[in-house]
Amino acid sequence: MAGTASTIRRFAFAFVAFGGLWTEPACAENSYDAAKLEAEGAVIGEIVLDKANVFDLNDPAENNAFYRLANLIHVVTKDKVIRKQLLFESGDAYSKRLADESERVLRQNQYLFDAKITPVHYENGVVDLNVATRDLWSLQPELSLSRTGGENSTTIGLDESNLLGSGTRVRFMRDEDVDRDQTIFEISDRHVGNSWVSAAIRYADNSDGHSHGISAVRPFHELDARWSAGVRLWDDDRREALYELGEEAAEYQQEREYYSAFRGWSKGLQGSHARRWTAGIVYDDNRFGPVVDGSLPAAIPEDR
């Protein structure tokens, strides 16, 4: 419509708390040559976890009431969550490559600021390792208020990426806009049990339908990994509208079923490279029909 004025107001709120700069663990002053450890066939002995909270209270800049309270509230990542992501264990031959890859695996977590794995003691062919990690603040509120073209939109939610130090992510969100109202719940874990399987579940209850999804994926988690596999299932039912001059002019109901599965193969690390093959199958079915008790003319696309 010509001459129509549109006013947009947006408000966003987020609380993000980060730790201070990473400092080397106290034991880092003991330096051991990784190549020498490997050449001498060093065996991994004790694996010590050195876990730091979000804020370093030994730093005067971070030692205040607010940061002390944040550290008190925050649950530091549990030992078992760290250990199950290591590519080695006590009794294995020491490998600098596996230590470096384990650091990479740990750093991929949203709830960790950094990770360092350092040999700290070597005697009689046995090397002890220090695994130093530092947590990030993991609870993030979500709040967004906006107004566009006379219509209000509201989003409110909570996103916890490290529930009680378990490494599990939980997200709850309530979203209301001109198209639909949604209540969304998501839960995911990158390492289910003691496995390398990453699983996620999403449930959304909408004013015009629903949206459900589940996935389980075992990735190539290291350079020498020999296989990967995964499945994804998605079911979605919603009302869609067609607009003319900013107003709803027609509508239809869409039902979608999406399923996929894949399998990957590899001979593992060969020299300095790894070659991988992946094959999969996808089923994607979209069906369209009239909206039950609809108030607008139906404009129904062809199924595909």
Predicted regions and their residues:
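Immediate N-terminus of the mature polypeptide
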Residues: A2-F13, W22-R304
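Short, linear, compositionally biased motifs with a strong N-terminal bias
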Residues: A17-F18
